[in-house]
Amino acid sequence: MKRAVVVFSGGQDSTTCLVQALQQYDEVHCVTFDYGQQHRAEIDVARELALKLGARAHKVLDVTLLNELAVSSLTRDSIPVPDYEPEADGIPNTFVPGRNILFLTLAAIYAYQVKAEAVITGVCETDFSGYPDCRDEFVKALNHAVSLGMAKDIRFETPLMWIDKAETWALADYYGKLDLVRNETLTCYNGIKGDGCGHCAACNLRANGLNHYLADKPTVMAAMKQKTGLR
């Protein structure tokens, strides 16, 4: 039996990964992390979607220690979430230091226990947000370290790594879940479900990708299939 664990926030990317994983694996587990994030509504959204989509199990892990250590606009209400700035340089204040290091490591421990061969995460380098822990080289390096430390070949899969946001919408549509992803996920840094607040960086990236996809579905769908190997 093929098993996988999806790092699941209830947002567009991780929900699309879950939808695909349910088609590719016999048993899919979800793990969601409560790190005291400002947009904590995502945890309830993740619970609802994991149940609705048919995950075998869904664990919500308390990692609020991260909140004490990692200062970010996503962990401190005293730091405002910035509006999208297309020319902004450097690492944005929405970056939570160590978040993906912790999430992927804990997901791998869970995968070890449930005998899953893969940990799936929706990180992406194409629409690079300035987060160093979304890079392909980081994921591969951590995967190598975790496999060595557990003496077990647990594979970190990043199905969205080389597709852009428009193609991520195409992937959801390929599996017949575009409306679900659009209306029932929570990507917004301000904790607003669906299309979100419309002005944070996450909402801007999501909306631009959707508009691009809807404006030229055949071309974007073809590009997504070529990059992912889907038919």
Swiss-Prot record:
InterPro entries: QueC, Rossmann-like_a/b/a_fold. Its cofactor is Zn(2+). One of its GO terms (biological process) is queuosine biosynthetic process. Pathway: Purine metabolism; 7-cyano-7-deazaguanine biosynthesis. Binds 1 zinc ion per subunit. It catalyses: 7-carboxy-7-deazaguanine + NH4(+) + ATP = 7-cyano-7-deazaguanine + ADP + phosphate + H2O + H(+). One of its GO terms (molecular function) is ATP binding. Pfam families: QueC. SUPFAM superfamilies: Adenine nucleotide alpha hydrolases-like (SSF52402). Keywords: ATP-binding, Ligase, Metal-binding, Nucleotide-binding, Queuosine biosynthesis, Zinc. Zn(2+) binds at C188, C197, C200, C203. Gene3D superfamilies: HUPs. It comes from the Bacteria. Its EC number is 6.3.4.20. ATP binds at F8, S9, G10, G11, Q12, D13, S14, T15, T16, C17, L18. Catalyzes the ATP-dependent conversion of 7-carboxy-7-deazaguanine (CDG) to 7-cyano-7-deazaguanine (preQ(0)). Belongs to the QueC family. NCBIfam families: 7-cyano-7-deazaguanine synthase QueC, PRK11106.1. This is 7-cyano-7-deazaguanine synthase. The gene is queC.
